Amino acid sequence: MEEEVAALVIDNGSGMCKAGFAGDDAPRAVFPSIVGRPRHHGIMIGMGQKDSYVGDEAQSKRGILTLRYPIEHGVVTNWDDMEKIWHHTFYNELRVAPEEHPVLLTEAPINPKSNREKMTQIVFETFNAPAFYVSIQAVLSLYASGRTTGIVLDSGDGVTHVVPIYEGFALPHAISRIDMAGRDLTNYLMKILAERGYSFSTTAEREIVRDIKEKLCYVALDFQQEIQTASQSSSLEKSYELPDGQVITIGNERFRAPEALFQPSVLGLESGGIHATTYNAIMKCDVDVRKDLYGNIVMSGGTTMYPGISDRMQKEITALAPSSMKVKIIAPPERKYSVWIGGSILASLSTFQQMWISKQEYDESGPSIVHRKCF
């Protein structure tokens, strides 16, 4: 491989797709992982209506479209739409010819094997990439924080996972995955806003609620205390202007929605909260590495961006951990993109260049080669 060709790094999140060039310090393109199709057939001839829209364009025309996310809980559920998103990434966002660049994609841990095989197949057969690699998202986040040992709590739009990593290797027996993340919090916020009399139901309106969540929600340090404060005064209330100019007020919903991260039972889920899941994952690891994990709890992903989340996590884990243990939560300000940044670092390392799966190897072995070369 010649040095001058930059690898493409694409972090396909359930909610947002982050794409750019290896060696850059931030992704060039960040757009919603959405494919929208018109709800009604166009009546005006010559309007140039397309049969599908991707990303920001789908978002801006959402009023007339049905929006679909091809990635659910970190797993691709609709490959045709996924192909559209990749096509859009290469040709419209990055403006590159994929057959000229190695491609690094990311995936959630404990994803079905068939998922990575299909990814490999599409990259080589549809887009003719010269080389390909797929990497676990949490491991990349850890690289981005400059560590090789730590436990990563990665929570995006579709899936949350806790991954203990020692000297660069994920410890598979201790990985935990919770199928609860940003999208579920958005749905929950829709539900509790409905109790206030604000009804949001369509796929387009869900995007409004997502915006409310991102702008106004926070994590309470003490949930009961905060509920009390909210009921006694209006100091926690904030107003939000809807696209049609109507102004709505939201109060305790601001911290009730993200509280589901610590109490998934409010969503009807059996799993423990993110604090308990992190603690249990540490306890599944060898007793000698636990100290290093407690001292390096790294947060990554957009759902860890709520104000107050690190303090609450610190409080909850400290309560569970042995009393003498030093607990440290690392929440880098750029954690929304840390998976992508880690991918950019990895793909530009000179030692990584022999790790790529080449087109030739793929032609010889088929999609299953991905299990041998990427771990």
UniProtKB/Swiss-Prot annotation:
Q: Does the keyword Cell membrane apply?
A: no
Keywords, A to Z? ATP-binding, Cytoplasm, Cytoskeleton, Hydrolase, Nucleotide-binding
Entry superkingdom: Eukaryota
EC number(s) on file:
3.6.4.-
Looking at the Swiss-Prot or TrEMBL record, what is one Pfam family this protein matches?
Answer: Actin
- Gene Ontology annotations for the cellular component aspect, listed alphabetically: cytoplasm; cytoskeleton
Q: Which Gene3D superfamilies match?
A: 3.30.420.40, Actin, Chain A, domain 4
The record's catalysed reaction(s) read:
ATP + H2O = ADP + phosphate + H(+)
Instruction: Give one GO term, molecular function aspect.
Output: ATP binding
Subcellular location as annotated: Cytoplasm, Cytoskeleton
Tell me the SMART domains matching this sequence.
ACTIN
Q: Work out whether the entry's keyword set contains Nucleotide-binding.
A: yes
**SUPFAM superfamilies, alphabetized:** Actin-like ATPase domain
Q: Which InterPro entries match?
A: Actin, Actin/actin-like_CS, Actin_CS, ATPase_NBD
* Family the entry assigns: Belongs to the actin family.
Its job:
Actins are highly conserved proteins that are involved in various types of cell motility and are ubiquitously expressed in all eukaryotic cells.
What name does this protein carry? Actin
Q: Which organism is it from?
A: Ajellomyces capsulatus (strain G186AR / H82 / ATCC MYA-2454 / RMSCC 2432) (Darling's disease fungus)
